[in-house]
Amino acid sequence: MSNSDRSATGFSYNTRLNILHGPLETIDVAGLVEACTDRWYNQTLCKVDESVVRLGVVHGEYHWHKHDNEDEFFYVVSGQLLIDLEGRTIDLTPGKAIVVPKGVRHRPRAPERTVVLMVERAGIVPTGT
């Protein structure tokens, strides 16, 4: 399943909820990143118990949103990810991570091409509310 919405700046979000890999399958994250041509790409890589691991290759800004029932974990592999919250901005660079708690309005944005791994509950709607 793919969901392609548009950002505030006019480019499409490419959100893929299909799970690419099962247990004991090697995941070529670098290959997926290299092949990505989208400005905002979000692919579910695998399921771990009741959570999923997603790969984000992003450049630009996402819309303001929140997840009412799920926390969201972001880990920056390369680039820079800014997480805007109401009242402050968190700056994540390679090797840095954060958990955005459920119910907190936030807006991820990347001033340059950025690679992010995200962990969240399998049923989460990535676009939020």
Predicted features by range, described:
Residues 38-39, 52-68:
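Conserved short histidine dyad/triad with adjacent acidic residue
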Residues 49, 77-78, 93-94, 112:
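A cytosolic small-molecule/anion-sensing beta-strand core signal
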Residues 57-59, 67-84, 119:
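Short, conserved beta-strand element in jelly-roll/cupin
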Residues 102-129:
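Ligand-binding loop in jelly-roll beta-barrel domains
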Residues 85-86, 94, 110, 128:
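Short glycine-/acidic-enriched loop or helix-start segments at secondary-structure transitions
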Residues 50-52, 59-61, 80-82, 89, ...:
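Short, charged/polar surface micro-motifs in flexible loops or helix N-caps
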Residues 86-102:
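Short acidic-glycine-tyrosine-enriched beta hairpin
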Residues 1-54:
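A short, N-terminal "cap"/entry segment at the start of jelly-roll beta-barrel domains
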